[in-house]
């Protein structure tokens, strides 16, 4: 008896629809007899929040086009982005719905059931970390947003927020314990 981990890639377009909800359906092939811990994995893109330099007639001073004080764009992700991206999860087997819950439910379950250490791990996995939702106060910054500066020397700018993979555990009824699993027979 052995345990094998495998990855199931989504078959279809991998872009999120910005006008309507995106529905992703996965079919679990019968690689084994039982299905255990299950995760959704999303990749957040790298974000560059720039400060643009507009040259004026007087010279290359930093000002906006109207001559007013310049306020740069400061992008940040929302808190609990990994679970807030999920509106609904439904698990089917043989055409029968076995479970249905939301990303908000996953969040509430974390707050209700997990220890402090497990919450910290969950937050790192799902992207609920200051580097994503409060970059102006993360990584040693204090109310100082890490804007990307594009310079004339051709060097690549440092991103404001680095891209990363989010791992969202689908804590279904068969994932509660290592002794539990969903039969794939």
Positions of predicted regions on the chain:
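Short, low-complexity Pro/Thr/Gly
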Residues: 1-185
């Amino acid at each position: 008896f052995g345990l094998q981990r495998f990855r199931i890639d989504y078959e279809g377009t991998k872009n999120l629809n910005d006008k309507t909800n995106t529905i992703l359906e996965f079919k679990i092939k019968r690689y084994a007899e039982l299905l255990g811990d299950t995760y959704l994995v999303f990749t957040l893109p790298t974000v560059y929040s720039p400060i643009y330099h507009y040259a004026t007639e007087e010279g290359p001073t930093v000002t906006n086009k109207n001559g007013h004080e310049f306020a740069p764009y400061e992008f940040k992700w929302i808190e609990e982005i990994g679970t807030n991206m999920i509106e609904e999860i439904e698990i089917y087997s043989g055409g029968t719905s076995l479970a249905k819950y939301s990303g908000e439910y996953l969040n509430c379950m974390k707050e209700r059931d997990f220890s402090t250490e497990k919450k910290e791990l969950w937050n790192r996995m799902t992207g609920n970390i200051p580097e994503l939702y409060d970059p102006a106060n993360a990584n040693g910054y204090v109310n100082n947003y890490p804007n990307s500066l594009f310079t004339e020397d051709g060097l690549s700018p440092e991103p404001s927020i680095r891209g990363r993979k989010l791992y969202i555990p689908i804590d279904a009824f068969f994932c509660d314990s290592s002794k539990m699993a969903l039969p794939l027979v």
